Regions:
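Catalytic domains of carbohydrate-active enzymes, especially glycoside hydrolases
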Residues: 82-85, 242-267, 351-352, 468-478, ...
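Substrate-binding cleft of secreted/luminal carbohydrate-active enzymes
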Residues: 473-490, 494-570
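Helical hinge/lid and interdomain linker segments adjacent to catalytic or ligand-binding clefts
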Residues: 61-129, 250
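Substrate-binding cleft/loops of secretory-pathway carbohydrate-active enzymes
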Residues: 367, 423-493, 523-526
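Active-site-adjacent "subsite" loops/lids of carbohydrate-active enzymes
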Residues: 291-352, 396-409
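A glycine-centered loop/beta-turn motif at secondary-structure junctions
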Residues: 62-63, 77, 115-116, 165-228, ...
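Non-catalytic C-terminal accessory domains or segments of carbohydrate-active enzymes
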Residues: 213-216, 547-702
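A glycine-rich, often tryptophan-bearing local segment used as a flexible ligand/cofactor-contacting loop or short
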Residues: 99-180
Length: 702
């Protein structure tokens, strides 16, 4: 807020305002909410004298926020998780006034002209807007209910005793203390702006108390500044057996999901009904511009394969069949078993129109390692014979008479080497499928063993042995967030990324898999990541890795879908330079946009009715007349360049590790790729399938 200065007439106005504010503050308290208009009538009289001091909203279209305190608390992490950027108050549109903030009637003009003001706790400024302590007894707050997910238990690790606040008439209560109903968060729209009030600070990390603050801001009209369309998500048809796949494909695309990794073991053996469902799912995804990967969980093959081949089942250290949790593990060291499984995998990859294959968790059980013999694998006869030939003893002795550390270390190292050879062997098998389908992308999902170093001994995972394969093979190394660190905060993702970057020069091939599930640890305020916690996780991960995958789409809660794509956007800079807006992003980004635009001085055809899509790097955007030609409304691939050629033609350059999918505003009629005429391969009326790699596309439409 700006100073009134030293002008004599301004001083008189300030004194008048002070007296009127004193009278206002002296009005008797009421126990029930009272109309905002009656409270603010006198303040609107003051406002007329203060119009000249209202800050000009010169940066209203920039996603800047300012915390009006030397101690910003967790607000930068909260607001930054959906792309808002911290800047000085003079250029910001969003303001956080922390507990004890001083009142100023200047705020009415700011809010009515578009500012968003967040009020934390009790203050004279909150009182000014009608959020004030009532005469009711304080309440002990330990649990909340929130309108965004009323049935979700929201439990605070440390309860607080808080006043019961009155809220102004017309305000919407978003969260209440679960038993008394006392308001904990509430919001109010004023003119073009809004007020969000919270009863207490949000917590050290920003999500300990009020998980849906960002959802409340969105309800009040705050639009996120960026969106990404690069997320991956895992999909298991067992949770979506009778759903409208067209509806869900549209929903996934709106949430920023670029690829679905579909549980392929359900279709390992041909079955008419299941195969028809999967074919329909793939077609629906392709129409919406979503890629579909076959997700394998070897050594689990399928229920039928397990039932049909008892002799090939994996064994635990107590010589029981390795049916562990939902996975029924097969002995892939056995050459007959391997040949049967590899033939089935090749057939499955060939039966459906996949865009890629994901080999996930291709190592051994379990997270408890040798401490739990009933879950420890592999202990089948083939592995035991191989190890005995090499080391001179049966590894089963490790769970009996041979308990020395040297022997134990010998087998654990052998086991990690076996897992690495198994991974390389299966990547080679998939290269055979790639010969028939050259556009297939390959992914190896591998649990983290750098951040949680115990994983190598527990399950045989050793990233340092696997990552050199990137020197000779083309695949994405998808790092799975291990269950042992699910309770840690989002700051772990930059740390994980740093450790893996030290192991390989192929940083663009590193991705991270976030498990969005109920955690077994004692975590607060929700058992599953949701709201601000989820957005912080996704945002930190997107800023640290080339790709972010979510396990799994069915576990994502409905309130999270609207802001998920914004949390996944990684933008380092946005600023005005004259009439242009400069945006710098790591992997390309979408920005809210209506009407035509120029990007870097050229008419830009890559936009839909609401979003303009930019390539990675810095780009200057400015308004322009709407181009008459076709538009590239969606691209599942990395956009490198685009230009409007004429009223019927556009040209763009893309790069993709898999097949790419492009959706246009008009029906394609003629296609040239790298200067060569090609027959359009359509997945929908205006949806085009494009080859893997980097290519220049020239498209003529009707």
């Amino acid at each position: 807020m700006r100073s009134l200065g030293s002008n004599h007439s301004l001083t008189v106005v300030a004194r008048m305002a002070s007296l009127m504010l004193r009278d206002f503050a002296a009005e008797p308290r009421q126990s029930e909410p009272r109309p905002l208009g009656s409270d603010l009538r006198v303040l609107r009289q003051i406002l007329a004298s203060f119009v000249v001091f209202a800050c000009v909203a010169c940066a209203a279209d920039l996603p800047y926020f300012s915390v009006l305190s030397d101690d910003a608390g967790a607000w930068p992490e909260i607001l930054g998780s959906i792309g808002l950027q911290r800047q000085p108050a003079g250029v910001s549109r969003i303001f956080v006034a922390r507990t004890g903030a001083a009142a100023s009637v200047e705020w009415f003009a700011r809010v009515e002209r578009g500012a968003v003001l967040i009020l934390e706790g009790e203050s004279s400024l909150a009182d000014l807007f009608g959020f004030r302590r009532s005469r009711k007894d304080p309440v002990r707050v330990q649990s909340l209910s929130d309108v965004h997910h009323p049935t979700l238990p929201i439990v605070w690790e440390k309860g607080l005793e808080l006043p019961v606040f009155e809220i102004p008439e017309g305000a919407q209560v978003f969260a209440r203390e679960r038993w008394s109903g006392a308001p904990m968060t509430a919001g109010l729209k004023l003119g073009s702006g809004a007020i969000l009030w919270v009863a207490a600070p949000p917590g050290e990390r920003g999500y300990e108390r009020f998980p849906y603050l960002l959802n409340a801001l969105a309800d009040l009209g705050l639009d996120p500044p960026f969106r990404s369309n690069r997320l991956w998500a895992f999909f298991d048809s067992a949770y979506r057996t009778r759903v409208d796949v067209d509806y869900f494909a549209t929903r996934w695309r709106k949430a920023g999901i670029a690829a679905l990794h579909v549980a392929a073991w359900h279709n390992f053996e041909p079955e008419p009904e299941g195969d028809a469902y999967l074919k329909k799912l793939i077609e629906a995804c392709h129409r919406e511009g979503i890629l579909v990967y076959a997700w394998f969980e070897l050594p689990h093959v399928s229920e039928k394969f397990w039932a049909d081949h008892p002799a090939w089942r994996e064994q635990t250290a107590v010589l029981q069949d390795a049916q562990l949790d939902w996975r029924k593990l097969m002995n892939l060291t056995n050459r007959e078993c391997f040949r049967a499984v590899s033939a089935g995998v090749r057939a499955l990859v060939g039966r459906f129109d996949w865009d890629g294959v994901n080999l996930a968790e291709l190592y051994f059980e379990s997270l408890e390692g040798m401490a739990n013999p009933s879950r420890f694998t592999p202990m089948n006869a083939d592995v035991r014979a191989l190890f005995q030939q090499e080391a001179g003893f049966d590894p089963r002795e490790l769970f009996g008479t041979r308990a020395d550390e040297a022997s134990r270390r010998m087998f654990l190292d052998f086991r990690a080497g076996l897992a690495r050879r198994m991974q390389e062997e299966w990547l080679a098998e998939l290269d055979i499928s790639r010969r028939a389908k050259p556009d297939l992308d390959l992914v190896l999902t591998h649990v983290d063993d750098r951040f949680d170093t115990g994983m190598r001994d527990s399950i045989g995972a050793d990233a340092a042995r696997v990552l050199p394969l990137l020197d000779t093979r083309s695949f994405t190394f998808l790092i799975e967030d291990p269950a042992t660190v699910w309770h840690l905060g989002p700051e772990r993702y930059p740390a994980i990324a740093e450790r893996y970057r030290a192991l390989t020069p192929h940083k663009d091939k590193l991705a991270i898999d976030l498990n969005i599930v109920e955690r077994y640890q004692n975590v607060y305020p929700t058992k599953q990541q949701t709201g601000t916690e989820l957005f912080q996780l996704v945002h930190r991960a997107a800023g640290s890795f080339a790709r972010v995958a979510l396990y799994f789409e069915n576990s994502l809660l409905p309130p999270d879908l609207k802001l998920l794509a914004s949390a996944a956007a990684a933008v380092s800079r946005i600023e005005h330079m004259g009439p242009k807006t400069v945006i710098d992003s790591a992997a390309g980004v979408g920005i809210p946009w209506k009407g035509g635009a120029k990007v870097d001085g050229e008419l830009w055809p890559a936009q839909d009715d609401e979003t303009l899509w930019l390539p990675a790097g810095p780009h200057a955007i400015e308004p322009a007349p709407q181009a008459a030609g076709p538009r590239l409304v969606h691209l599942n691939g990395d956009l490198k360049a685009a230009r409007a050629v004429d009223a019927k033609t556009l040209e763009f350059t893309y790069q993709s590790a898999s097949r790419a999918i492009a959706i246009f505003s008009r029906v394609p009629v003629k296609l040239r790729i790298d200067g060569v005429d090609e027959a359009p391969q359509l997945a929908g009326p205006a949806t085009l399938l494009l080859p893997r790699g980097q290519h220049v596309v020239t498209l003529a439409t009707d």
